[in-house]
């Protein structure tokens, strides 16, 4: 049984290393394990547009066709207000999920807004049309309706006028307020900021801004549909992060949909072609995408990101459901192939791996001979027919005899 388990482990490790070597441009030195939740687990639909965690710790997923709620083990069904639920949520697109200071949940379902009363377990539609944007700011709920911002008055169960947007800039698609109580809106013509004199000024005239996000250092990040990610400090663009084809330190795509920050201050960027981790302090970028292997995201096109109370990052994809992982926990390390470097393999195709009694690794390759890695220093020694007396570089399998401390190989015969 031990031998069988060891063989399974080695085969899994081989698959991981093969996958990483083939995809070395898109993957970082260290990796994460993603847990995936899909339709087979009870999701109403595999396209996730919004994610939120409520006061009870449950995860809410807004999809193209309705709402799903996950308690950590399974999807659950809320029973209150079935008629309202069916009319406004079931089969509708849930674009946004936010929460007020009383822990009520607000859902933008198509162009209506539905409130879920947590203490009453009841749904209530509080506006049936003309919802262009919704946000929770300071525990209060605000919506953009035509050329105005309205504030929800829960005590009187009504919408109160908050402010008029005195600009002719098209439909408002997003409303935002930073920690300095400065207001921003996004329209089809760009991002506008309100100044103390009540005037609105365009600070980024790009017509495809997806969202605004404020990081812990006070920077405002603007995700765009085709122009990458912009960083603003004091209304000045100080950084523009884009996709540079063929470059490792690059965004997966210039189509950026969503941004959030983890507990360590790293920025996570969801794009149309994968997930990026951006170090604000160093400028380093790591990339993650679906590769079809166990532990990967199921889909690379990302629409939603959410950091939960325990620090887990939830990723909503276009057609792969939800993926969740811990940004603070790495489970594997990637060793690329570069025969000129002692910290790399000398050949990208790995056919077998064994560990000797000193815990060092012996890795046979299908074309590069044998690689030995010291587990303490992580330095490789490359052994091939040219410099070590091996009879072949095309090795198909490797076995270790612990009693005799010897290696056995199966090689390819021409």
Predicted regions mapped to residue ranges:
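Carboxylate-rich, polar loop motifs that coordinate divalent cations or form catalytic acidic clusters
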Residues: 1-414
């Amino acid at each position: 049984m031990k031998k069988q388990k060891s063989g399974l482990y080695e085969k899994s490790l081989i698959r991981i290393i093969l996958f990483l070597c083939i995809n070395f441009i898109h993957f970082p030195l260290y990796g994460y394990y993603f847990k995936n939740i899909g339709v087979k687990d009870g999701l109403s639909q595999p396209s996730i547009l919004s994610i939120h965690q409520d006061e009870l710790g449950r995860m809410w997923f807004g999809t193209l066709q309705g709402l799903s709620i996950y308690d950590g083990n399974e999807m659950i069904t809320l029973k209150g207000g079935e008629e309202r639920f069916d009319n406004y949520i079931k089969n509708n697109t849930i674009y946004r999920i936010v929460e007020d200071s009383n822990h009520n949940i607000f859902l933008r379902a198509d162009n209506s807004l539905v409130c879920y009363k947590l203490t009453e377990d009841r749904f209530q539609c509080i506006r049936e049309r003309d919802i262009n944007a919704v946000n929770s700011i300071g525990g209060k709920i605000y919506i953009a309706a035509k050329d105005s911002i309205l504030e929800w008055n829960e005590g009187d169960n009504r919408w109160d006028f908050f402010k008029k947007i005195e600009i002719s800039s098209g439909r408002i698609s997003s409303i935002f307020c930073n920690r300095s109580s400065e207001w921003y809106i996004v329209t089809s013509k760009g991002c506008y900021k309100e100044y103390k004199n009540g005037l609105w000024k365009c600070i980024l005239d790009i017509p495809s801004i997806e969202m605004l996000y404020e990081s812990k250092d006070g920077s405002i990040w603007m995700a765009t549909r085709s122009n990458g990610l912009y960083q603003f400090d004091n209304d000045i663009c100080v950084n523009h992060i884009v996709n540079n084809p063929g470059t490792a330190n690059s965004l997966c795509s210039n189509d950026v949909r969503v941004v959030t920050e983890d507990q360590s201050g790293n920025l996570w960027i969801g794009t149309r072609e994968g997930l990026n981790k951006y170090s604000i302090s160093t400028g380093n970028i790591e990339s993650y995408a679906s590769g079809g292997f166990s532990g990967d995201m199921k889909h690379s096109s990302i629409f939603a990101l959410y950091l939960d109370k325990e620090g887990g990052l939830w990723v909503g994809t276009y057609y792969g459901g939800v993926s969740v992982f811990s940004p603070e926990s790495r489970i594997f390390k990637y060793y690329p192939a570069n025969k000129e470097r002692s910290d790399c393999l000398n050949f990208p195709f790995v056919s077998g791996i064994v560990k000797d009694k000193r815990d060092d690794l012996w890795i046979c390759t299908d074309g590069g001979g044998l690689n030995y890695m010291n587990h303490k220093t992580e330095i490789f020694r490359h052994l091939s027919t040219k410099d070590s007396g091996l009879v072949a570089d095309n090795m198909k399998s490797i076995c270790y005899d612990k009693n005799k401390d010897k290696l056995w190989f199966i090689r390819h015969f021409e």
